[in-house]
Amino acid sequence: MPFGLKLRRTRRYNVLSKNCFVTRIRLLDSNVIECTLSVESTGQECLEAVAQRLELRETHYFGLWFLSKSQQARWVELEKPLKKHLDKFANEPLLFFGVMFYVPNVSWLQQEATRYQYYLQVKKDVLEGRLRCTLDQVIRLAGLAVQADFGDYNQFDSQDFLREYVLFPMDLALEEAVLEELTQKVAQEHKAHSGILPAEAELMYINEVERLDGFGQEIFPVKDNHGNCVHLGIFFMGIFVRNRIGRQAVIYRWNDMGNITHNKSTILVELINKEETALFHTDDIENAKYISRLFATRHKFYKQNKICTEQSNSPPPIRRQPTWSRSSLPRQQPYILPPVHVQCGEHYSETHTSQDSIFHGNEEALYCNSHNSLDLNYLNGTVTNGSVCSVHSVNSLNCSQSFIQASPVSSNLSIPGSDIMRADYIPSHRHSAIIVPSYRPTPDYETVMRQMKRGILHTDSQSQSLRNLNIINTHAYNQPEDLVYSQPEMRERHPYTVPYGPQGVYSNKLVSPSDQRNPKNNVVPSKPGASAISHTVSTPELANMQLQGSHNYSTAHMLKNYLFRPPPPYPRPRPATSTPDLASHRHKYVSGSSPDLVTRKVQLSVKTFQEDSSPVVHQSLQEVSEPLTATKHHGTVNKRHSLEVMNSMVRGMEAMTLKSLHLPMARRNTLREQGPPEEGSGSHEVPQLPQYHHKKTFSDATMLIHSSESEEEEEEAPESVPQIPMLREKMEYSAQLQAALARIPNKPPPEYPGPRKSVSNGALRQDQASLPPAMARARVLRHGPAKAISMSRTDPPAVNGASLGPSISEPDLTSVKERVKKEPVKERPVSEMFSLEDSIIEREMMIRNLEKQKMAGLEAQKRPLMLAALNGLSVARVSGREENRVDATRVPMDERFRTLKKKLEEGMVFTEYEQIPKKKANGIFSTAALPENAERSRIREVVPYEENRVELIPTKENNTGYINASHIKVVVGGAEWHYIATQGPLPHTCHDFWQMVWEQGVNVIAMVTAEEEGGRTKSHRYWPKLGSKHSSATYGKFKVTTKFRTDSVCYATTGLKVKHLLSGQERTVWHLQYTDWPDHGCPEDVQGFLSYLEEIQSVRRHTNSMLEGTKNRHPPIVVHCSAGVGRTGVLILSELMIYCLEHNEKVEVPMMLRLLREQRMFMIQTIAQYKFVYQVLIQFLQNSRLI
C-alpha cells in the first residue's frame, strides 16, 4: 500500500457501556448501594431502585440529594435525566437518600418502613448537630436510640458496647471524663426503657425530636428588600424569616401564600391576604431558581394535603408512658415551634391532582397500607463519628410514588393494616344510573316447599337470573361521619384472617406464626376409616417412585406428607388383574389421581421452560378411548401422526357420533372394521401393563413418564381380542363412511418437515414411552344422574393418538375442525387415505350440519364426545345399563354424605343461601369510591373492602395503588389458606394485574372463565398467545412470555415467564384456565371441575416446593372470573370445604360463605352456583367411598 497506515481492528465500540452509568446512593443507615442506570434514566427511576431495596412504599416523603460543586446540598430534579443533572451540578456522582417532607406528627406516616426511615433521618439530624438540644435531651434521646437499635438492657452482660456507639452530637466537644459520665447516664436511661419494643422506642424518639428547635427546617442565606442579610427558612408550616442573630422576624403560612417564582436573582413570594409580594435576593440566578422551585414544591405539597394549612383545636400533648404502643399513638398532636409556639395538628385530606414539580415525578400525598411486614433494620454494627456525613441543614425533599417492585420471593407478605378513613373519600353524590333494580323478595320456606311439591320450583334452574347481584345498598359507604382507625401492629396477623375450626366457632382472633402453615403439608390426623389407603389404579408407580431429595419413602409416608386425593372408584365388578386394569375402568374423569399416570410424559418445551417444573407440566388430559378397529394385527405404532390424519378422523367421528346420539345412551354400538358386533359376555382379559419409573418430584395430580425421544419404539399388539357384548339395537352408518374408515392405512402417514418434537394443539401424537397398543386411559362421561358411558381402549389402531404435546400455536380445541377445513389442502401434509376419501367425509359433514339443528336437546351429551374425538380417541366398547349404574346401596355413605345430599334434594340450600348476607354490613370502600378508580372496576357495585384490598405500589398512572382485588384469608384446621380474588383484567388494567402478581409473589393464576362467552367479553386476554410474535407481550413494567400450553377436556394449563424490566428478575407463573363453564348456569360435569381443583392443588404444591427456604414460602393464588365474585367464590368455597372433608373438620358451607363475603362482597352470586358447591362436595365424597 502506498500509505503505511495500519488500522487496529481489535478495539470495539461498546454501545451498551456508553449508554449506562453507575451511581452510588448513601442510605440513611450509612450503607452505600450502587445503581446501574441508562443515560436517559430519570431521578425517579433511581429513587424507585432505592425504594425497592428498602421495601418502601410511601416515597412521597423522601428524595435524593447531592453535594454541588460549591459543596451545597441540592435536591435532584426527579423528572430530568439523572446523569445530565449530576454532570452539570454535582461534585461527584454520589447521591444521598433522605426525608424531604417533614410532618408535624409521626402519626401521618402509615407504614412501618416509612417510620423507620423517618427515625433514621431525625436521628441523623440530631447526631450531626442540626438540632439544638440540652444535655438532658441528648441523654434521653441517646437512651431511646439504644433501646431502638439494640433492644432491652438485660440482653447484654455489660454496657461497654455503648463506648463504641455514637450517642452524642458531633459538635458536642466533651472531655473524656464527662463523656464517660454521660455514657453511664445513657446506660441508666437505656435500662429505664427496658421492655419497650424497638418500633415503639423509635416513635418515642421521633416524638422527642419533634419538640427540638430547628426540626424539619431548611435555611438559606438571602437579603431582604432593604438589603439586610437574613435567613430565609422553610418548614412544614410555611416560610419564616430570621435575622442573622436568630431572632424570628416574620412567618408566612401556606394559606397566606400564592405563587412562588423568581425573576433573575430575586425570589418573589405572593401574599394573598395582604395583596403584596415579599422579595428576597440571592447571589446568583441559579440559586434563586433552585430556592423558588424548592419553595413552590413544598407549598404545593403541604397545601394540597392540608398539612398545617388551617388553624384547628388540637388536643393537649400526650404524656409519654413506658407501655406506649404505636396503636395508641394519637393522630393529632400539637407541634411547638420555638419561640413562636404555633400549634398545628389538623389532619389532612387527600387530594389526587397531578403536580408538575421539578423535584417530584408525582408528589401527591397518598398514604397506602403496606402489604409487607417489614422488620426493622437495626443498627447492630459499630458506627464511628466519621461515618456520619455532615451536610447543610437540608432535610430530604422528594416525592414519588412509583417503585421498582421488590422480588416477591424475598418479601414477607402480611395483611395490610387499617387505613385512616377520611371523609374526603366519600363521594358527594350518588350514581343512580348504575344502581341495579332491587332484589326480588324471598318467599318463606313453606311457600318454597309447597311449590316444590307441586313441581313449580325447578331446583336446577330456579331464579338463576333473579339471584344475581343483590346490590340494594351499594352506596353504604357514603356515610358523612369521619372514620379514623389507629395504626395496627404490622408485625402481627390482622383480624380478617379468620379461623375455621371443627367446633364451628368463627372468631377474628389473630393467628400465631406457628399456625401459618401450608395447608397441603399440615396433616391433621384423621379417623382410622379415613386413613386407610388402598392401592388402586391411581398408584401404579408408587413402589418405584422417588420423592424429593435422596430418601426413599414408603407409600404411607408419601401420602402423609402430600395428602393425596382418594382416586376415582373401581368399576363393578372389580377387575381381577393385579395391575391397574386400564381397559375396563369406567372413571368419570381421569384427573391427577387417576390411571392416566402411566401415559403422561415430559415434553421438550417443559425442559426448556423450567427444569424443576417438569413433574407438573404434563398432559393432564381427560380422554375417552375410542378405537375404530378391533381385528388382530401386528403393526408398528408410530408416535407421530400428521395433523390432517387426526383432524379428518375427527370429522368422521363427529358424523358417527351424531348418529349415535339418536339412540339410547346405553344402546350405542361401535363401528367395527369388519362385520357387526359380536355376541358374547362382557367379561374379557386385558394384558398387564409394564411398569414405568421416574425420579422427579411428583404430586397426586402430576405423574409423568420420562422416556427417550430419540427413537421410535415398536411393540406388538396382544394376540387376544376382547369380546364386545351384544347390544339390543344396531347402529347403521353410511356404507361409504364405513368403507372410508376401513381403508385407513395401518402405516403411519408422512411426517411434517422440520422439527419433529413440536406440534400444534390440534395435532396428536403417541406417548414417548414404549407402550403396548392395548394400553390406554379410561373415563366415564357423565350426562345425568343415572346415565353413564363406559369407554375403554381394547385394541387401538395405528392412528390412535394418546395426548396433546406442547404447541406452537394456540387454537381452541373446538375450532380445530373449522381451521383445518379452511386451510388449503396444498398447504398441509395429507395422508393417502384422506386425500382419496375427502369427498366422502365432506358429504358426511354436510349431513351432520343438516341434522345438527335437530340435536339441540342433546347438546350437553354431544359436547364431551366431540372433545374426546378431538383428542384422537374413540369408543371401543359400551357396557349395558346394568354395569354402568352405580349401586348406591354399596356406597358406604357417611353422615356428611347423607346430610349434604338431603339438603340438596329437599331444597334446603335455597333458604340457607337466602339467609347469608350479601356483603359486610358496615363495609368501607374509601379508595374504591374515588372518581379516578371508578374506571378500574368492571362492575362499579363490586369493589373490595378497604381493610383487605390488594394495594399496589403507587405509580404515576395509578397514584392510589388501586386494583379491584381482595385478600381472602381463612384458617381451616390450623392451616391458613390465602387467595386473591379479583376481577378479570380490563384492557387498561392489565399492567396493574401483572404488577399485583409480581408484588404479591403469585405463582399460580386460576381463571374460571373464557375470554368471551356468548359474544360478551368476560376477561381481557392478559397473556400472549402461543405462536404470536416471540410469544411475548409487555404490560407496563413487565414482559410476559408464553412457554407452553396444554389443553385437557375441561381446562388448559399454560406456563408463563414474567420478567420485571427494571430489575431484570424473572419468575415462573402457572396459568390454569377452566374452559368448561357454560354461558348460563353451572358446569354439568362435576367430576371435571374436581379434576380442575386437583390440578390447582398439584401446581400449588410444586411451586411452594420451589420456595423452600424463602420468606414467602406460601404465596397466595390469584383466582378470577369476570367480576371476581361468582365463579371465583365457587372455586374458593369448594376447595376450602373439600379440605374440611379431607381432614374431618366440621362442614359448615353457609358459615364459610359468610366469612368469604365478609372479605369480598357477593361471593357466589346465584343459588345455582351455591347448589353446584354442594354437588361438588357430594361427588367428592362419593369418589372417596368408591375405592
Curated annotation (Swiss-Prot):
Stretches for region Disordered: 510-531, 671-690, 787-824
Residues with the Phosphoserine modification: 314, 461, 486, 591, 593-594, 642, 831
Compartments, record wording: Cytoplasm; Cytoplasm, Cytoskeleton; Nucleus
Segments of skewed composition (Polar residues): 510-524
Domain Tyrosine-protein phosphatase positions: 909-1180
Modifications after synthesis and translation: Ubiquitinated by the ECS (Elongin BC-CUL2/5-SOCS-box protein)/LRR1 E3 ligase complex and subsequently targeted to proteasomal degradation.
PROSITE patterns documented for this protein: FERM_1, FERM_2, FERM_3, TYR_PHOSPHATASE_1, TYR_PHOSPHATASE_2, TYR_PHOSPHATASE_PTP
A matching Pfam family: Y_phosphatase
Tissue: Ubiquitous.
Active site: 1121
Subunit structure: Interacts with FLT4; the interaction is enhanced by stimulation with VEGFC. Interacts (via PPxY motifs) with YAP1 (via WW domains); this interaction leads to the cytoplasmic sequestration of YAP1 and inhibits its transcriptional co-activator activity.
Protein family membership: Belongs to the protein-tyrosine phosphatase family. Non-receptor class subfamily.
Protein's UniProt name: Tyrosine-protein phosphatase non-receptor type 14
Taxonomic source organism: Homo sapiens (Human)
Gene responsible for this protein: PTPN14
